[in-house]
Amino acid sequence: RTGIIRRHIVEADTTVSMAAQAAEKALESAKMLPEEIDLLIVSTISSNVILPCTACEVQKQIHAVHATCFDLNAACTGFLFAYNTAQAYIASGMYKNVLVIGAESLSSLVDWKDRSTCILFGDGAGAVVLRAEEGESYHMVTHSDGSKGEALTCDTGSFMKMDGQEVFKFAVRQVPACIAEVMEHNHLMAEDIDYFILHQANRRIVEAVAKRMKVELTKFPMNLQEYGNTSSASIPLLLDEMNRE
């Protein structure tokens, strides 16, 4: 039902080491040196330690000596919030070259006896480099609903707990609405869009979103069958695969 065939679980690696590897590959792809990065943001809910922040640890490993660093915690939406934050900093003129990383070791937060979560989540990291460019525009639509917070929780020193049905209903209702809002602002129709890049939660959610939007499923790339739900890492992992193809 989930569409997940396999997942990847860390053994020797950590959230920091995966994030650093993803960062190095992103910089290589962008043909940039680490010292050119002036802001480094890591989105994660599975840091190795509380302090120092994961972004500072990544900075140390990749030698991004000029980067300001901080972490961001927004769970599965984390990469998008980090991306939007990076874009806002670039638009303000404060920073020009920003490295955004989504990295998770969710296996450390999973109760392997709880089938509502243990069959879904995996470990991974992905990264993108954003650069200031003349004439580029970007429109974001973001919303939050704290009243739904109990649908997915993780107490300190405990495991993730999820109300799968509530998460499904919320995603299928709100994701199409946000997409419609973005398209309306940009005067676009679904047929104008090549791909809709969604968080890779599970296949049922992606299929339900496509159905509600009345858009063919081929416009919704998926790699969740290979990685499972990697929270903050899922969108940059998918973007990287599509970029390499």
Model-predicted segments: where are they?
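Condensing-enzyme catalytic core mediating Claisen C-C bond formation in acyl metabolism
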Residues: 1-12, 113-173, 177
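Claisen-condensing/thiolase-fold acyl-transfer catalytic domains that form or cleave C-C bonds
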Residues: 16, 20-23, 27, 46-47, ...
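Phosphate/pyrophosphate-binding loops at sites that engage ATP/ADP/AMP, CoA/4′-phosphopantetheine
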Residues: 22-38, 177-194, 242-245
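Anion-binding (especially nucleotide phosphate/pyrophosphate-binding) glycine-rich loop
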Residues: 29, 33-65
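A short, small-residue-rich loop immediately preceding and capping a beta-strand
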Residues: 38-42, 68, 97-104
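Acidic-glycine-rich active-site phosphate/pyrophosphate-binding loop
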Residues: 49-63, 99-106, 150, 154, ...
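Short, well-ordered, mixed-charge alpha-helical segments that flank or form enzyme active sites
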Residues: 49-51, 78-81, 106-110, 146-148
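Conserved beta-strand-centric core segments of catalytic alpha/beta enzyme folds
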Residues: 83-144, 238-245
